[in-house]
Structures are given as C-alpha cells and as structure tokens.
Amino acid sequence: MHSVVPAAFADSRQVPAPQPPGTEMPRTAGRVLIVEDDASMRQAIERLLGAAGFEAGSYGSAEALLANGAAADARCIVSDLKLPAISGLEMLDEIRARGWQPPLILITAHDAPGLREEAVRHGVAALLAKPFRGSALLDAIASVTGRDRPGLPAG
C-alpha cells in the first residue's frame, strides 16, 4: 500500500497508514483539535494523532471551530497560523475571550521574524515551523499538556 503524505511532514514514516476496521488503537490520550485549511495536511495530522491514541477533531477554518464550541474541553488545539478569514492568533484571542483554556500549538510555513514573540504575547504554547516531523508534533503536545508523549504503534 502506498500513501501520499503532505510535504509538511519531513519524515513520512511518522504518518501511519489507516488501520483495518476493528484494529484501531483505543483513543484514550484525550481530544486534540486540528484547525488547518489545507485538507491533506489536516488529514495527515488527524491520522498521526489517531495512531498515537488521541481522538482528533478536524476543522477547515477558525470559524468552524468557534461555532462548534469544541475548544471548551479540548486537551489542546493544533492550528495553522494562516487561515482563510480569522488567523490562528485571532482564533486564540477569541477562545480566551470565551474563557476556554486549551493550549494552542501553532504551525506555520511562514516563520517570519518577530512571529515567535507575537505568538508568546497571544499565549501560544508552542510554535512549529513547517515542514516538521510527526514526532515533533507529538513531543509538543506532550509538553503543553504535561503528559507523557504517546507513541506510535510498531509497524
């Protein structure tokens, strides 16, 4: 079986192929929300998180996430910086204004000068520049949630 993996994952071995029905790992590591307008990237992150034991919720825009209200009880959020209408940073401001406190991991292909400082001012918990390894994202999730890093199944 051959899988196409977005270029944002520098190591395609970190994105496992979907498992046959009935053989998935139990999702016990918590709910992680993904906000990414690039469908292939969003699906790759969702597969990675699922294989690591997370329940992943996916959204193609900040507006979709905010309308859903799912951020209120998420373990953390992984969001692209550049989204169609509301940026990842603006979304985080709105999440905080609503009193929700999940940590946000910001991913971006535009790691411009001053971005890290701006991200810190907005309360971003971690920033990953694309392309990144799947293991780097799992490490960031473990770091911002204060939990041990879940592993990927052998194979």
Language model segments and positions:
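Conserved acidic carboxylate
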Residues: 36
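Charged docking surfaces used in two-component/phosphorelay signaling
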Residues: 43-47, 51
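The feature encodes the CheY-like receiver
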Residues: 42, 84
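Short amphipathic alpha-helix used as the core "switch/output" element in two-component signaling
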Residues: 67, 89-100
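Active-site residues of response regulator receiver
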Residues: 80, 108
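Alpha4 helix (beta4-alpha4-beta5 surface) of REC/receiver domains from two-component response regulators
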Residues: 90, 111-126
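C-terminal output helix
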Residues: 114, 132-141
